[in-house]
Amino acid sequence: MLKLSHLTIRHTKDLRDLVRDLSLTIHEGEKVAIIGEEGNGKSSLLQVLMSSKSLPDYLTIEGEITTSFHSYAYIPQTLPEALKGKTLEEYFFGEDELDYATLYRLADQLHFNSERFASDQTIGSLSGGEALKVQLLHELCCPHELLFLDEPSNDLDLETLDWLQQMIQTSPQTILFISHHEDFLTQTADTIIHLRQIKHRKEAETIVEHLGYQDYSNQREQQFKQQSQQAANDQRAYKKTMEKHRRVRQQVETSLRNTKDSTAGRLLAKKMKSLLSQEKRYEREFQSMTSQPYDEEIINLHFPPLTPLSPQKRVLLLDQE
């Protein structure tokens, strides 16, 4: 079990939250996908879940992480420097204790020539897809309870991708992974952690659903439509109410200005006071009405106001002979 309680991850250089108030319990055997746009903190969350004690200087965390898992493996998006100079022989027959029966069985499934395990070829000389395949073979033959994968579907051919999908589906291990590949997500995930940056990418929104990816996407789309429609209805009703209220107020104001009867004036003043109180109540109600849902901006481009150049300023001088 991996339990997160009110976890917040803050990027101190950008002065923004990447993850806000995330509470979640991940049970043995769950397949958890972390999704979101580039720069939203997916890899940072993966790092924090692996080890909250050895983080980059620019990350700070609040909240609590507890786990009953004793060992984990991590396959990053890019090949680690420490592996680039290792030979295949050193990697597969070095210090790590591997289940060699499983290793050779998986190699056969992946059509990876098992004779290459004793090769002096360096891992850094392999293609991106082969390097990932080699890391998968190695880590799946170690006795890890928890597996972290950062963009595992990148660089893989279709046959290996199909194999990886089936492996994740059938593996008894708990697997947390990052992916943008929608079909891969649909075939593998049973829990979604969605990291979003809303309000011009100034506010973090962290969503957790114990659903497959397709069900989650359909639910999000339906909720977005329903909230948009409800917000539009609320705004129309508020506008209609306020227009009626303003007409009544204008009538009372006109009567107040024109009346010469003190008794009538007092009554009109009381009515005006009541109308002003009513107006404040309408405004408070408006604040609690359904708001339009935020659609995340993918690219963070915001320009400050531009100062026009002087008409006399020379920008380009082209001299043609």
Residue ranges and their predicted role:
Residues T122-L126:
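Conserved ABC ATPase signature
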Residues L136:
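Hydrophobic anchor residue at the start of the ABC signature
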Residues L4-L7, D14-E30, G63, R314-E321:
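Conserved beta-strand
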Residues K31-E37, S43-R105, R196-R201:
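ABC ATPase nucleotide-binding domain signature region
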Residues L147-E151:
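Catalytic Walker B motif of ABC-type/P-loop ATPase nucleotide-binding domains
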Residues M1-H11, L98-T102, F112-Q121, Q219-E321:
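Coupling and communication elements adjacent to P-loop NTPase active sites across diverse families
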Residues S179-H180:
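H-loop/switch region of ABC-family ATPase nucleotide-binding domains
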